[in-house]
Regions:
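Helix C-cap/helix->beta junction micro-motif
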Residues: 7, 63-64, 192
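Active-site phosphate-binding strand-loop segment of PLP-dependent enzymes
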Residues: 23-72
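Active-site-proximal loop/turn and secondary-structure-junction residues that shape catalytic pockets
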Residues: 45, 74-76, 108
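Short acidic, glycine/serine/threonine-rich loops at helix termini
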Residues: 2-6, 50-53, 78-85, 113-116, ...
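PLP-dependent aminotransferase-like
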Residues: 1-34
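Active-site C-terminal subdomain of aminotransferase-like
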Residues: 84-196
Length: 196
């Protein structure tokens, strides 16, 4: 919502299924019109931790020739390692032909300091729209790949350091531990009257 507000874009919020808390694909399909510029799915969404049917959203994107963004800000550093951790997931990423971009926050399950996030693009076609270039600045051409112009590199260096330290195996192990702990807590809650 923040980016849409900055850019003057109206968001059409698609209803979710009351039981699964996943986006209603039929409702999403009905809401697509000639002003639709993108479809977005959560993998997972923050309040309930459920993953939208990214395959279905990808199919809609292909059908209507619309880019599909996967918001994996919360779980991007978990779901990317689920298969290797022994918890297979349905495809949610660039394995799906309609997915054009994915976001992930490095400061959540990436274990990096707060202040950096990732946006990955299927191709440079969409990434090129992210850049801002102002050729008439008195100091020369001013270009920046983000809304924030000048940024300190410390957070990015710290993020890189954490990723190098943990490595793929570290993220796989963390994912396995988190999922197993979540399942143990879920089982324990089942035995507590009044909780579900």
């Amino acid at each position: 919502d923040k980016a849409a507000d900055l850019l003057g874009i109206r968001i059409s919020h698609v209803p979710v299924d009351e039981v699964t808390r996943r986006v209603d694909l039929r409702a999403m399909s009905r809401m697509i019109n000639n002003k639709t510029i993108m479809l977005v799915g959560s993998a997972p969404q923050f309040p309930h931790g459920t993953m939208d049917n990214i395959q279905g959203i990808s199919d809609l994107g292909l059908k209507y020739n619309l880019p599909v963004h996967v918001d994996a800000c919360l779980g991007g550093f978990l779901i990317a390692f689920m298969d290797d951790a022994g918890f297979p997931l349905k495809p949610f990423d660039f394995r799906l032909a309609g997915v054009t971009s994915i976001s992930a926050d490095t400061h959540k399950y990436g274990y990096a300091p707060k202040g950096s996030s990732l946006v990955l693009y299927r191709s440079s076609f969409y990434r090129n729209y992210q850049y801002f270039c102002y050729p008439d600045w008195p100091g020369g051409i001013y270009g920046t790949p983000t809304i924030t112009g000048s940024r300190a590199g410390g957070i990015i260096a710290a993020c890189w350091g954490v990723m190098k330290l943990l490595g793929r195996e570290g993220y796989v192990t963390a994912t396995r531990d988190i999922i197993n702990t979540t399942r143990r807590i879920t089982e324990a809650v089942q035995d507590v009257p009044g909780l579900k």
